[in-house]
Amino acid sequence: MKIRIGHGFDVHKFGGEPPLILGGVDVPYEVGLIAHSDGDVALHAISDAILGAMALGDIGKHFPDTDPEFKGADSRVLLRHCYQLATDMGFSLSNLDVTIIAQAPKMAPHIEAIRKVLAADLVADINDINVKATTTEKLGFTGRKEGIAVEAVVLMIKA
């Protein structure tokens, strides 16, 4: 059995028009995130983690923000593409752990919906998907409600 670990990190600044999409879920909030795609910072971090585990670079390499094809792109489509690259190499997801770092909005009401989206898109058991949220106790750019950061770690296995 071959095992690979991938880590992903992404940040987006508040300021775009709603909706705010996190983990494939519309989260009610007064502003969205500024981005070339739909700005789903969670799915971007997860995509990077998968690509990293497979030694395939990052989402900027696969979906450059200079390419008009990806303007406003649905990040769920990008995530599924990244996961397909891994499955084409014979790997599947063992587990995923995601940390959303945001002072606002409150994420607790949305965690289960995000887990369901991720389980569907990654063809995984929901019990292999963990999503949690934390604040920075009002410190830094997330604490000042200037944006959201997300970290993701994946464990990929090849039987």
From Swiss-Prot:
EC number: 4.6.1.12
Cofactor details (free text): Binds 1 divalent metal cation per subunit.
Presence of the UniProt keyword Transferase in the record: no
Top EC class, one word: lyase
Pathway: Isoprenoid biosynthesis; isopentenyl diphosphate biosynthesis via DXP pathway; isopentenyl diphosphate from 1-deoxy-D-xylulose 5-phosphate: step 4/6
GO biological processes: isopentenyl diphosphate biosynthetic process, methylerythritol 4-phosphate pathway; terpenoid biosynthetic process
Domain of life: Bacteria
Catalytic activity line of the entry: 4-CDP-2-C-methyl-D-erythritol 2-phosphate = 2-C-methyl-D-erythritol 2,4-cyclic diphosphate + CMP
Binding site residues for a divalent metal cation: D10, H12, H44
Ligand binding (4-CDP-2-C-methyl-D-erythritol 2-phosphate): 10-12, 36-37, 58-60, 63-67, 102-108, 134-137, 141, 144
Gene3D superfamilies assigned: 2-C-methyl-D-erythritol 2,4-cyclodiphosphate synthase (3.30.1330.50)
Essential cofactor(s): a divalent metal cation
A GO term, aspect molecular function: 2-C-methyl-D-erythritol 2,4-cyclodiphosphate synthase activity
Cross-referenced Pfam families: YgbB (PF02542)
Keyword Metal-binding: yes
Site residues, Transition state stabilizer: H36, T135
UniProt KW keywords: Isoprene biosynthesis, Lyase, Metal-binding
Stated family: Belongs to the IspF family.
Its biological purpose: Involved in the biosynthesis of isopentenyl diphosphate (IPP) and dimethylallyl diphosphate (DMAPP), two major building blocks of isoprenoid compounds. Catalyzes the conversion of 4-diphosphocytidyl-2-C-methyl-D-erythritol 2-phosphate (CDP-ME2P) to 2-C-methyl-D-erythritol 2,4-cyclodiphosphate (ME-CPP) with a corresponding release of cytidine 5-monophosphate (CMP).
HAMAP family to which the protein is assigned, alphabetical: IspF
Quaternary structure and interacting proteins, as annotated: Homotrimer.
Record protein name field: 2-C-methyl-D-erythritol 2,4-cyclodiphosphate synthase
Source species of the chain: Shewanella halifaxensis (strain HAW-EB4)
